[in-house]
Amino acid sequence: MFEELGVRLAQPEEVHEIMAEALRACSENGFANASQIKVLEQVWCGLNLDNGLIGVIGEPGKLEGGILLRITDVWYSDDKVLEERAIFIPPEYRGVKGGRARRLCEFAKQAAKAMEMPLLIGVLSNHRTEAKVRLY
């Protein structure tokens, strides 16, 4: 379903690589201190399709980017939504031809449509915010 975007579902055996990039993204955002346990809980659920999923670009061991999506509800409703928790692109792939972040956003849109859920996606950062705003 997502092959045309060059995005695939991440597998549980990729947990260490995904964690490294997710923690880097948390550190770069600098919004709050990251808890490795909380990040791992989110990542593990996504890797095992337990109320979430992780789309990645690249082969195992050569991750070029990823997006963590979780199924949750918004604070005022019992309706389920697909929520973006993080998009991460390793520094060596940022600004390089290939539109990785845009492809991951499109993956999120297609996943939400396939799941018949609204998509909650946006910007939470105090670092590189201008580039993220242009992305959306």
Can you say where each PLM-predicted feature lies in the sequence?
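Conserved acetyl-CoA binding element of GNAT-fold acetyltransferases
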Residues: 78-92
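Conserved acetyl-CoA-binding loop-helix of GNAT-fold acetyltransferases
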Residues: 89, 95-110
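A short helix-loop-beta-strand connector motif used in the catalytic cores of GNAT acetyltransferases and
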Residues: 43-56
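Alpha-helical elements of Rossmann-like donor-binding domains used by nucleotide-donor carbohydrate transfer enzymes
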Residues: 17-21, 42, 103, 107, ...
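Conserved beta-strand-loop-alpha-helix junction that forms the acyl-donor binding cleft
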Residues: 104, 108, 120-133
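Short amphipathic alpha-helix that is part of the acyltransferase structural core
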Residues: 1-37
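Conserved beta-strand in the GNAT
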Residues: 56, 62-72
